[in-house]
Amino acid sequence: MSISRRIATLGLGLAASFGVSLAAQAQARELTVASSATYAPFAFENKDKQIVGFDIDIINAIAKQQNFKIKVVNTPWSGIFAALNNGDVDLVISGVTINDKRRQSYDFSAPYFAAHQLIAVAKGSTVASLKDLTGKKIAVVNASTADDVASREFGKTNANIRRFESTPLIISELAGGGVDAAIGDNGVIAYRVSQNAALKTVEDPSFPEEGFGIVVKKGDKALQDKLNAGLAAVRADGSYGEIYKKWFAKEYKGR
């Protein structure tokens, strides 16, 4: 064999070895996922202190389809976007509503859940709509969509709007009589109210439909595209419907 052929063969061998190494690294890449585990049934800790829920199953299904690994980190809602900004996590999945304000700072996947706001009140309450809460004490999660809704309707500095750091806290405040109503995303409010016979939910048709999205850093198109491809695939193969039925005990009829 000539020297030139030996060099060429050696070069091909090194290239192949390098390619296999890169492929292995890509396959082994682990993405860190922030989720606030106070948001049942989307994300919460089970009795074994594992973070489980609809959001967790969805991101796991996407990761499996797109051949990457994930590590879920329980992150308080108040610090969840800072964790993404600082590079402590690669993405956020935590029932985050896609809206124009957030789009200015972050990029989102396609919507993975259709939601709307829902009011929780005591069983004997006569509240039938958002407007009926005028002059009443309202609990919301700080910096949430419900906070935006209440602030627009009643004024951001209205002393009757009580802000808390998690959904369990607003429901606890309502159950204890500290407020007249709590507002939040329908999935989590309905779940919490179903566990307390003294409470009920109130639907207001004026609440628009919202979409939950997976959040990535602004400009991270590669990860955004990967998430969208995975989400489309789990919808197409039926995995999404199975996960939805597992957590909401009914067939998926939405988008």
Task: Give short role names for the model-derived ranges.
Residues 26-95, 237:
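Extracytoplasmic small-molecule ligand-binding "clamshell" domains
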Residues 35-39, 73-78, 87-99, 123, ...:
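Beta->alpha turn/N-cap motifs
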Residues 37, 113-121, 190-232, 250-255:
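Periplasmic-binding protein-like
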Residues 45, 59-68, 146-164, 193-197, ...:
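Ligand-binding cleft/hinge of the Venus flytrap
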Residues 56, 72-82, 125, 162-176, ...:
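Short helix-initiation/N-cap motifs at beta->coil->alpha
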Residues 68-69, 85-94, 136-137, 166, ...:
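Alpha-to-beta junction loops
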Residues 79-82, 96-104, 149-152, 175-176, ...:
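A ligand-binding cleft/hinge motif common to bilobed small-molecule-binding domains
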Residues 121-138:
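Flexible hinge/capping segments at coil-to-helix
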